[in-house]
From Swiss-Prot:
One of its GO terms (biological process) is trachea morphogenesis. Keywords: Developmental protein, DNA-binding, Homeobox, Nucleus, Transcription, Transcription regulation. It is found in: Nucleus. Its main location: nucleus. This is Homeobox protein Hox-A5. Sequence-specific transcription factor which is part of a developmental regulatory system that provides cells with specific positional identities on the anterior-posterior axis. Also binds to its own promoter. Binds specifically to the motif 5'-CYYNATTA[TG]Y-3'. InterPro entries: Antp_homeobox, HD, HD_metazoa, Homeobox_antennapedia, Homeobox_Antennapedia_CS, Homeobox_CS, Homeodomain-like_sf. PROSITE patterns: ANTENNAPEDIA, HOMEOBOX_1, HOMEOBOX_2. The keyword Transferase does not apply. The gene is Hoxa5.
Length: 270
């Protein structure tokens, strides 16, 4: 296609600026228009025309240059016969074109040169695109590394700031005085789960209140035991054990007193 566009009109139109552009005949009827254009093309090109017109609106200094057109089609133009329907003479509205000059004598066909030039241009364009792609990838990698470095920098700065900040001191434990401690707690973990239970240490106030209650009543009811336990911050079991131990002690004391009294009374007998 490139050779056709470049070398299509060099021999037939040597004086490109002097050539007058054609019009497509009379526009009064469509059939006459197509007939005129067909006859014009068949008479102008001199070979089998298939209906395509590539010379519309073409001046002396055309887009592709009128002096370099159609050098490789002289032989085809002279050898190929025109089809019957396109063999009509040109209409009177168009001036007949001059006879074509032999383009083969002017210059050889540059089709192979244009083909090689196209290959070279394709190779150059592919190499340029590959270089551009590599530079684009390298630039992306550079951007990615830069962004990663920027992300690492704030993280390291935050860590450094967190390390530089003084750690908050642990809250000071409130001071506990002896009277604030719970002394009546069963220490089950001292001798193990199956070991002996530790003795409960009663305070002086608790012992005094328990002695008063024992003086008035040696046996406590369930209701009274609950009241004393709540008043002295003790459990019902602790109150129950204390009263049991106190009764045993009282019995022992009374037994010794009775025995001493009995011994003293027997000695004074006459």
């Amino acid at each position: 296609m490139s050779s056709y566009f470049v070398n299509s009109f060099c021999g037939r139109y040597p004086n490109g600026p002097d050539y007058q552009l054609h019009n497509y005949g009379d526009h009064s009827s469509v059939s006459e228009q197509f007939r005129d254009s067909a006859s014009m093309h068949s008479g102008r090109y001199g070979y089998g025309y298939n209906g395509m017109d590539l010379s519309v609106g073409r001046s002396g200094s055309g887009h592709f240059g009128s002096g370099e057109r159609a050098r490789s089609y002289a032989a085809g133009a002279s050898a190929a016969p025109a089809e019957p329907r396109y063999s009509q003479p040109a209409t009177s509205t168009h001036s007949p074109p001059p006879d074509p000059l032999p383009c083969s004598a002017v210059a050889p066909s540059p089709g192979s040169d244009s083909h090689h030039g196209g290959k070279n241009s394709l190779g150059n364009s592919s190499g340029a695109s590959a270089n551009a792609g590599s530079t684009h990838i390298s630039s992306r990698e550079g951007v990615g590394t830069a962004s990663a470095a920027e992300e690492d920098a704030p993280a390291s700065s935050e860590q450094a700031g967190a390390q530089s900040e003084p750690s908050p001191a642990p809250p000071a434990q409130p001071q506990i005085y002896p009277w604030m401690r719970k002394l009546h707690i069963s220490h089950d973990n001292i001798g193990g789960p199956e070991g002996k239970r530790a003795r409960t240490a009663y305070t002086r106030y608790q012992t005094l209140e328990l002695e008063k209650e024992f003086h008035f009543n040696r046996y406590l009811t369930r209701r009274r035991r609950i009241e004393i336990a709540h008043a002295l911050c003790l459990s019902e079991r602790q109150i129950k054990i204390w009263f049991q131990n106190r009764r045993m002690k009282w019995k022992k004391d009374n037994k010794l007193k009775s025995m001493s009294m009995a011994a003293a009374g027997g000695a004074f007998r006459p």
